[in-house]
Amino acid sequence: MFRTVLALAAGLLVALPSGAALAQADGFGVAPQPRPGNLASFTLRGGVQVRPEFPGSDEYEVGPDLGFRFGGLEIGRFGIGDPDPELVQTGLGLRGSFRYVGERDSSEFEDLRGLDDVDDALELGVGLAYRQDAYQVFGDLRYGVTGHEALVGEIGADVFVRPTNRLTLSAGPRVFFAEDSYAQEYFGVSPAEALRSGSLEPFEAEGGALSAGIEIGAQYRLNDSWGIEGAVTYDRLLGDAGDSPITEAGSDDQYGVRVGLTRRITFGF
């Protein structure tokens, strides 16, 4: 059922006009008056984050945080978004979506002894968002091109407050969905694994809404090229993700913190 819903959502995205389909992360609308020449702009983020060691864990690790956000693209008379870093692009548009999920080496955790290891995963996909000056709503759809090879999705919303023209504060809810194979990969326990473990019961995890939470973020623009960005997240594991023996040995409350520098790059070609 979940795969069918995601497939329909993907079909709707594909059916959008081809101009909109070229939009990437945070690229909204089509620029009505493109500048002469070819231009492209995007923002890279690099920093550190604190996150659970694996989904359902009550232990945390510090690791790198990377991000990408699309700004604008102009080719001849055709344009999407805008290279202007001060412009708040509004309306309905597509955006890119990606997420990295680290590996799980079960031998490193006493509670997971006997379970199969889980490879790290890179999820790539697209999202549809509607944005205004004071808020946005969005839905993202991704596929694990490495690792779990499952469809996952996220829906959410944000409200924006801008105390100054350089500082943007945001806050909003998030709900994460995944299909059965993802849920089984991270939260399931096969009979063979349960036998090897000696402490965990067999558990067949099903997909659906696996977590719900909130993200509170801040962006500060140092100048036209550089900025500082951070966020605090909280997610509560739901459904079989929350009922899993793996989670019961850890925690269904999942926290995260990230902070990093952003660099906006604009170039002609």
Which residues does each PLM region occupy?
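Extracellular loop and loop/strand-boundary signature of outer-membrane beta-barrel proteins
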Residues: 51-54, 110-114, 140-144, 199-204, ...
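Outer-membrane beta-barrel transmembrane domain signature
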Residues: 24, 86, 150-154, 158-252, ...
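Bacterial N-terminal signal peptides
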Residues: 7-17
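Outer-envelope beta-barrel architecture signal
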Residues: 36-44, 60-64, 76, 88-94, ...
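Residues on the lipid-exposed face of transmembrane beta-strands in outer-membrane beta-barrel proteins
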Residues: 46-50, 66-72, 82-87, 126-130, ...
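Transmembrane beta-strands of outer-membrane beta-barrel pores
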Residues: 48-54, 72-74, 98-104, 132-134, ...
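Short glycine/proline- and aromatic-enriched beta-strand/turn motifs that initiate or cap beta-hairpins
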Residues: 22-76, 269
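Solvent-exposed loop/turn segments connecting transmembrane beta-strands
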Residues: 53-60, 118-120, 142-152, 208
